[in-house]
Structure formats: C-alpha cells, structure tokens
C-alpha cells in the first residue's frame, strides 16, 4: 500500500484537508496550501490567538491588520440607527476566507454580540467557537438533525440580541464554466426561515470582486461528483479537491489589498413580514444584496495573478 510521506505541520487546523478525505487528496491539498503561504499565515495565527484573542477587542479587525487586508466601505458604518428587533446580516460570498473575516470585522463594530453560520469543519480553529454556529452540509440524517438544532439556537440568540451573520450560498461564488463573472451558488432557504421565525430585520451587504481564473476553471466540473457513473464522480471529486486546495491561495492574493463592501438600508421586519412565502422572502433578500453590486466594466480576470507579498 502506498504511503504518503508527510512532515509535521504547525497548526494543522489551518487547512481545508480533513481526515475523511482520501490520503492522496489530503496530501495534494496540504501541498498546494504550503505553496500558497499557509505556514506564513500559521505564524500570524499564532500571534493572533495568543496576543489578540484574549483581549476580546477588535478580534477580527486586528486579524485583517495582521494579514494586511483592508475593508473599504463607502456607507456609514455602524449604521446611525438600528431597529429594535432581532438582527441578521446577509452577504454574498465571493472569496471564501477573506469576506468571512471582513464581515465579522464589521459585525464586531456594532457593539453587540454576534455569531456567524459557518461550515462545521472550520470549528477546528478553536478560537472561532465563541463566534460561530456550525452548519453541516452533508445530506445525512445526523446533519439534518444538527442543522435543525442550530437553527433553533440561532433563533434563541437572535431574540436575546445576538446578531447572526449568514452567507446564504453556503459556498464560494463560482464563474459559470470557468469564465466571466462569478455567481453565488444557489441560496439556501435557511435565512428566510430564520428571519421569519425570529421576526428579524436584515442588513444586506455586497462584497465586490471574485477569486482568480484558475479557481473558477478547476471548479467547473465539481457538480459531477453528484452524478451516477464512476468517471463522473471521479472528475467531480477531483474538481472539488482542486477547488478546496486553492482557497488559501486566494486568501493570500488579498494581502496588501482592500475588500470593497457596500451596505444597504436595513430591511425592517415590518417590511419583510408581509412576505409569507419563504421563496418570495428569499428572493427579496437576494435582491437586497445584489442590487448593491456596482456596475463595473468588463475586465480581464488573471489566470495566474501576480504574487503578492504576505504580511510578515
């Protein structure tokens, strides 16, 4: 049996590889992440978890400072007035790691507790636990049971004044067939259900930009993993492995740059309440986010972007 030689890696939780993947897939993901500068980020993570997290102050804003990523927002933030209702923040998901940290850096400026709905595998980073609600995207009975419990917990927290952050796509935006503008993956019904059950108002946010061309090209066949047929499944799983391995590379590309975000007017519960049909409500939330997108001229998306200097 072939055994892959591996070296001890600092902070193994800072990886998208997981024990449920085949050994070859884990090795490949680790290799690409290493070439993308993962170990440099591990050193910054070590400083962040020891020196920043214990203070409880600007935890995510200071994380962005460490990795030299700015957040450029033309709108007033925090908003001058917030409704006296439970509050949900909903955003698109163009980058993966970068917009996740950016939205949390904005949420912490509201001066109230907050949680983000994230993939359960990301809770390997223990420092994220106090700020997270884990979602299981596998379609098992246990996953359904877990997600129902998480939804009930989210509603309870909303009623207690905790802001909940949701990326309704549940995954990183992808360009159709690898070219053109990236599009959010189909939105899940979860946020509409959450808003209705908690009678929450919503702050829509739109993050501009997208990952590099290579990320989208390798993502093209990922849906084949759900098809019948060994060849289709193999191609689909290989695509997912390649896509996953590039997420840290895409995060590294943001270093030295600013993420542009636009914030819409608060969608009050009184405005959303008449939308009893959840699909209609979800469509309204979707428009609330993507109506904020700036009208940009078509631009060339780099296949292999210039290497960016990582923060020391």
Language-model segments: residues:
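Short, charged beta->alpha transition segments
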Residues: 70-79, 118-121, 151-154
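Membrane-anchoring hydrophobic helices of lipid-metabolizing enzymes
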Residues: 1-87, 100-102, 109-111, 130, ...
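Residue-level signal for well-ordered alpha-helical scaffold segments within enzymatic catalytic domains
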Residues: 62, 102-105, 109, 156, ...
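Non-catalytic C-terminal accessory region of glycerolipid acyltransferases
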Residues: 11-13, 148-312
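Catalytic core of membrane glycerolipid acyltransferases/transacylases, capturing the structured
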Residues: 42, 87-143
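Short coil/turn connectors at secondary-structure junctions
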Residues: 84-85, 111-113, 160-162, 199
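Residue-level detector of flexible, active-site-proximal loop/helix-junction positions
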Residues: 78, 121-123, 139, 209, ...
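Short, flexible loop segments at the rims of nucleotide/cofactor-binding pockets, characterized by
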Residues: 31, 64-69, 140-145, 180-182
């Amino acid at each position: 049996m072939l055994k892959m030689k591996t070296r001890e890696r600092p902070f193994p939780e800072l990886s998208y590889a997981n024990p449920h993947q085949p050994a070859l897939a884990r090795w490949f993901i680790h290799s690409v992440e290493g070439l993308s500068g993962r170990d440099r980020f591990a050193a910054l993570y070590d400083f962040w978890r020891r020196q920043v997290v214990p203070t409880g102050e600007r935890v995510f804003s200071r994380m962005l400072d460490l990795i030299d990523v700015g957040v450029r927002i033309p709108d007033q933030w925090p908003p001058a007035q917030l409704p006296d209702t439970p509050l949900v923040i909903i955003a698109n998901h163009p980058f993966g790691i970068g917009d996740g940290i950016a939205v949390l850096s904005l949420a912490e400026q509201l001066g109230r507790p907050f949680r983000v709905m994230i993939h359960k595998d990301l809770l390997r980073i223990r420092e994220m636990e106090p700020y997270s609600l884990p979602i299981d995207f596998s379609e098992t009975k246990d996953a359904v049971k877990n997600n129902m419990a998480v939804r009930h917990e989210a509603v309870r927290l909303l009623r207690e004044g905790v802001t909940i952050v949701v990326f309704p796509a549940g995954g990183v935006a992808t360009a159709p067939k690898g070219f053109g503008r990236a599009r959010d993956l189909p939105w899940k019904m979860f946020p509409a259900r959450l808003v209705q059950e908690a009678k929450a108002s919503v702050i829509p946010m739109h993050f501009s930009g997208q990952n590099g061309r290579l990320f989208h090209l390798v993502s093209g066949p990922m849906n084949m993993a759900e098809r019948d047929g060994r060849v289709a499944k193999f191609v689909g799983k290989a695509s997912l492995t390649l896509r996953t391995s590039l997420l840290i590379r895409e995060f590294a590309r943001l270093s030295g740059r600013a993420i542009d975000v636009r914030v819409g007017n608060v969608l009050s519960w009184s405005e959303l309440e008449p939308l009893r049909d959840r699909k209609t409500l979800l469509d309204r939330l979707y428009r609330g986010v993507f109506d904020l997108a700036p009208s940009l001229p078509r631009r060339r998306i780099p296949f292999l972007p210039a290497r960016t200097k990582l923060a020391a």
